[in-house]
């Protein structure tokens, strides 16, 4: 009888043992290079993540997806992603940017300020202690056109902005999966959409390829993007990360008059690209981590076949 009673107690205890959360004290994450976090930081928590990007383009994909050589171009860009937890489920992020570019012996006259974005994130479902319950969030953002985009004199590289303000929206997912060796794999998925923002008036040389004396307007297209990402925690110091993403932009049109009064009308796109971003993570502590890797555009249409090494530090306060 005692033996059967003990067996019954064991069966009753089994679900409790299975439900015991995993130990996360030696697990640290920076996040992959491109994905957004499906969970918001705790109320009062500040996360600061500056990035540095170096992009080099020697090839481009044409309208049929074939790769061709183009005039080499290089650019440096830096952004700072600053996120603050307003409540445990609601967070705000601001993303300022600067850049420097060069091609065919011409370059920017110094460092250019780019557009600045803000976004707000609401977490619909919070993760549990060991991350095995998925986190889901919705994001709404806005881009402020603060970077130069036209009246660039004779140097078209001096433009760092788009000239248009626009909204963007995203749905985010994140979940941990504990492997047989006791280490976690964190998976993310992001789906984003930016509707067509409207038109922007242009004068002179601009980031849209217009020349000196041009007067007219540009109408940038909409964007749809998606990615999946995975991070593997090797130990409390090291981790591996990978993004696989896709982005599609609809047509951008430019119309107006050149410096001699002749009508000008052009359309570019639509464009698309597929990219992969492998990276390595290193953590000094639970509040400071580094990630470095590169983004490779391996397929696309009417887009650059660029390679973009990048690095970032994540600081949690």
Question: Model-found features: residue ranges?
Answer:
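Transmembrane beta-strands of outer-membrane beta-barrel pores
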Residues: 52-58, 68, 96-102, 124, ...
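Residues on the lipid-exposed face of transmembrane beta-strands in outer-membrane beta-barrel proteins
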Residues: 48-50, 80-86, 118-124, 140, ...
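Residues that define the transmembrane beta-barrel architecture of outer-membrane proteins
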Residues: 74-78, 109-118, 134, 161-167, ...
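Short loop/turn motifs that connect adjacent beta-strands in outer-membrane beta-barrel proteins
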Residues: 36-45, 89, 125-135, 178-185, ...
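Surface-exposed loop and membrane-interface regions of Gram-negative outer-membrane beta-barrel proteins
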Residues: 69-73, 86-87, 92-125, 250-252
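Outer membrane beta-barrel transmembrane domains
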Residues: 55, 59-68, 202, 212-317
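Surface-exposed strand-loop-strand hairpins of Gram-negative outer-membrane beta-barrel proteins
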Residues: 21-24, 53-78, 157-159
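Outer-membrane beta-barrel biogenesis signature
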Residues: 18-59, 128-137
């Amino acid at each position: 009888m005692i033996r059967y009673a003990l067996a019954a107690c064991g069966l009753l205890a089994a679900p409790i043992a299975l439900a015991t959360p995993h130990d996360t004290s030696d697990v640290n994450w920076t996040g992959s290079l491109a994905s957004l976090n499906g969970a918001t930081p705790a109320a009062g928590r500040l996360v600061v993540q500056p990035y540095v990007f170096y992009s080099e383009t020697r090839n481009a994909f044409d309208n049929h997806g074939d790769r061709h050589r183009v005039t080499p171009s290089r650019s440096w860009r830096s952004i700072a992603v600053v996120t603050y937890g307003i409540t445990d489920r609601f967070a705000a992020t601001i993303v300022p940017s600067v850049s420097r570019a060069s091609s065919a012996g011409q370059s920017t006259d110094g460092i250019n300020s780019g557009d600045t974005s803000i976004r707000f994130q609401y977490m619909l479902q919070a993760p549990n202690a060991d991350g095995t319950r998925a986190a889901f969030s919705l994001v709404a953002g806005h881009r402020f056109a603060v970077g130069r985009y036209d009246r660039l004199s004779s140097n078209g590289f001096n433009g760092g902005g788009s000239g248009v303000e626009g909204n963007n929206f995203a749905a985010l997912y994140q979940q941990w999966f504990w492997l047989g060796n006791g280490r976690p794999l964190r998976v993310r998925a992001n789906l984003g959409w930016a509707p067509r923002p409207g038109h922007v008036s242009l004068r002179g040389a601009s980031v849209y390829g217009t020349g000196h004396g041009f007067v007219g307007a540009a109408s940038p297209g909409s964007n749809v993007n998606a990615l999946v990402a995975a991070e593997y925690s090797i130990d409390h110091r090291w981790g591996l990360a990978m993004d696989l993403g896709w982005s599609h932009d609809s047509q951008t049109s430019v119309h107006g008059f050149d410096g001699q009064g002749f009508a000008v009308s052009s359309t570019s796109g639509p464009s698309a690209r597929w990219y992969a971003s492998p990276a390595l993570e290193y953590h000094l502590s639970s509040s400071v981590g580094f990630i470095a890797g590169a983004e490779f555009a391996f397929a696309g249409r009417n887009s650059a076949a660029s390679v973009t090494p990048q690095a970032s530090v994540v600081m949690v306060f």
